Each structure stands twice: as C-alpha cells, then as structure tokens.
Amino acid sequence: MSDNAQLSGLCDRFRGFYPVVIDVETAGFNAKTDALLEIAAITLKMDEQGWLMPDMTLHFHVEPFAGANLQPEALAFNGIDPSNPLRGAVSEYEALHAIFKMVRKGIKDSGCSRAIMVAHNATFDHSFMMAAAERASLKRNPFHPFVTFDTAALSGLALGQTVLSKACLAAGMEFDGEKAHSALYDTERTAVLFCEIVNRWKRLGGWPLPLPTDK
C-alpha cells in the first residue's frame, strides 16, 4: 500500500477538520439583533476510495429569540411567517443542541478533531450560528470559531460562478428556484456542490498530493 493510499480518510483530507454544511434563514442581516428562523445541517463522509458524499441531515424551524428584530424585507424575501404555528419551531437551544450533538458524534466516529462549517457565503451563516449558540449558552460548540469553507469562493475558482444556483448548474447539478431560500434545500444543494468540487479536484489528480521525490 502506498503512502498516498493512507490519505483517503475524512480525517486526512482537511487537516483533521470535519466538514459540516450549514444554511440558515433569518429575519435580517445582523446576527446579534435579527432572528434566526431556520437552520439545516448536513454532515459529510468519505467512502473507502476517498470520495466525499453527504451523510446525516438535521433541519429545524427556529423560534425568534426574545426581543429579536424581524425585518419585513427579509421575511418577504424568504417567505417565512415566524408566527405560523404550523412551522413547528423550536428554540435556538433545542436546534443547536441537537446539531452540535450530531456533529460531535461525527467528529469522534471519523477520527477528526474539530468541525468546520461549509456554507455559501459562509460568513453570514457562521455569524448567525455562533450568535445563536452564545445566546443559548451552549458551551461545547464543536465548530471552529472563525475558519470556514465558503462554497461561493470555491465555486468561483472551480466553476467560474459565485451564485449558488448558477454554480450548481455549472457543475451539472439540478437547482429548483422554487425551492430556493429553504434552509433544507439550500443546504442539500450546497452539500452536493461542495462534494462535487472536492471530488472533481481528486478526479483531476489534485488529491492526494504527489509524494516528494528526492533529487
């Protein structure tokens, strides 16, 4: 077995980071003051040949925290009615506690050391998740406090597109605009897109890295 064959595990691929795809829907742009309304998380796994694929999924509608701003423009954009009882919304604590529990198990099972968020325009999703975790006083946050994998940047490099829908189409994937701005759908599409970019780099010979040769 070559040394390169040892690099097919998830723990080897991203320096021990465990990638978790996240998307949020919110009632504005300010993570400190505007409500988190929906969040979805998809973990990733690798098969024995080192191909990346989606694994486990969690999805929650979230109750606005006490005193949260609800910007009408944001609600019109994502079509969410925070007061609709049919949403089955849970607290920020309940949503993130469940997601963090799933992620910590994935970290342990894969031999990774810490989770890293994968998201499209990741700064936005990261800021809202971290602010919600702080409000919920969740101490065991498995995610890196600032490092992310941004599929907008990766798509710009690999596909020449930065908009999620256009990047998916450029990658040969389907994208239903009617389902966009649902956290679950956008997370699923982002997960498949990230896996395609990582796997395409592998197919092109970019991974595993070539072994250094002595001259």
Swiss-Prot record:
Q: Which GO terms describe its biological process?
A: DNA replication proofreading; tRNA processing
Task: Name all Exonuclease domain ranges.
Answer: 20-194
- Report the GO terms under cellular component: cytosol
Residues holding Mg(2+) 2: D23, E25, H181, D186
- What are the protein's UniProt keywords? Exonuclease, Hydrolase, Magnesium, Metal-binding, Nuclease, tRNA processing
Instruction: Show the GO MF annotations.
Output: 3'-5' exonuclease activity; magnesium ion binding; nucleic acid binding; RNA exonuclease activity, producing 5'-phosphomonoesters
> According to its UniProt record, which cofactors does this protein need?
Mg(2+)
Q: Which SMART domains match?
A: EXOIII (SM00479)
Q: Where do the catalytic residues lie?
A: H181
Instruction: Please state which protein family the record places this protein in.
Output: Belongs to the RNase T family.
HAMAP family reported for this sequence:
RNase_T
- The protein's role, per its UniProt record: Trims short 3' overhangs of a variety of RNA species, leaving a one or two nucleotide 3' overhang. Responsible for the end-turnover of tRNA: specifically removes the terminal AMP residue from uncharged tRNA (tRNA-C-C-A). Also appears to be involved in tRNA biosynthesis.
Entries under PANTHER family matching the protein: DNA POLYMERASE III SUBUNIT EPSILON, RIBONUCLEASE T
Oligomer and partners: Homodimer.
Output this protein's name: Ribonuclease T
Q: Which organism is it from?
A: Salmonella typhimurium (strain LT2 / SGSC1412 / ATCC 700720)
Taxonomic lineage is: Bacteria, Pseudomonadati, Pseudomonadota, Gammaproteobacteria, Enterobacterales
Q: Which gene encodes it?
A: rnt
